[in-house]
Amino acid sequence: MATPCWSAVFVAILIASGAAQETPLPKVVLIGDSIRIGYAPLVAKRLEGKAIVLSPKPNGEDSGNVLKNLDEWVINERPDVVHINAGLHDLKLKDKSYQVPVAQYEKNLKAILERIRKGTTAKIIFATSTPILDTLHAQRKAGFDRFEADVEKYNAAAMKVMTQDGVPVDDLHRLVEDGGKEKLIGPDGTHYTPAGYEILAAAVTDSILHSMEGERTR
């Protein structure tokens, strides 16, 4: 299978000087939903001169969709590090049914880890799903519900899988809670203010650098 064209599939930011590099920069793939889309360019900027950052243009949506697109988004790119999240779309509630029930969510996460390990030598980092402000989210009238209690439930399920599989966790949920979610989350109760995205980007960058070489940015 041909490698996907970056201009069509990825937002790719090569952060390097114009001169040829003696040692190729490590390649990092960011996978996740619209929260990832928000922090991806900030992560790329923070990794300037240290990595090639790839971030698929499409929203990753739920864990089943990530699994379905894993070859295109991850495997074919042969990354050195994969920073991945899924969860906020899985726990969407409509007509009293979750988009992806938590038991299936766990199975999907296990399959994602297995597929990445089978198809690449990449280091994997899992990011927890970020908090929801229930009242503000409900005001969106988006045709589905999300609740913070479910975010916590799905994160707990993900943490169990990652602990069992020895995958390090970038706990973005705790980061936002500790930083004051009411001031970091925007008026839709889900997405972030510019300051919020900067805090997320710093944490994501930190986890990637720690995975690659033990560096710290904060």
Please name every model-derived segment:
Residues 56-61:
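Short beta->alpha junction loops
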Residues 52-54:
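Short, structured active-site-proximal loop/turn typified by the sulfatase FGly-forming signature C/S-X-P-X-R
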